[in-house]
Amino acid sequence: MKRQIAERSGRDGERRAALWLRAKGWSILAQRVKTPRGEIDLVAKRGKLVAFVEVKWRKTRAELDHAIDEYRLSRVAAAAEAIAHDYAQDGEDYRIDVILLAPGSFPRHIANAWQP
């Protein structure tokens, strides 16, 4: 039961993050993309930049400080690397972003969160 609630919360967070990105001028190219190396929550594009976005939803703002770490980011980066050629065309850049969400607070968008 807890897993189902967490899954639903995660999907709701991804939906909210997609809405927020669209409001900021991004197009959502894909959601929940599975790769052999992991899953990408959102793939977004604005201009010649593609962002592979990890979305984290927590019950409180305080919990957001510990929602993402280097290990999780490295998994997202590996997954993004596996599919980057499907979304970023010649001459386009890509990066790994994180969007942190909690009830009652604005989304916190960490652009270019992973730099190996």
Swiss-Prot record:
InterPro entries attached to this UniProt entry: Restrct_endonuc-II-like, tRNA_endonuc-like_dom_sf, UPF0102_YraN-like
Listed disulfide bonds for this chain? none
Q: Which Pfam families match?
A: UPF0102
Molecular function, one GO term? nucleic acid binding
Using the record for this protein, list the coiled-coil segments as residue ranges, or answer none. none
The text of the family note is: Belongs to the UPF0102 family.
Q: Which PANTHER family match?
A: UPF0102 PROTEIN YRAN
Q: Which HAMAP family match?
A: UPF0102
Q: What is this protein called?
A: UPF0102 protein ELI_05985
Q: Which organism is it from?
A: Erythrobacter litoralis (strain HTCC2594)
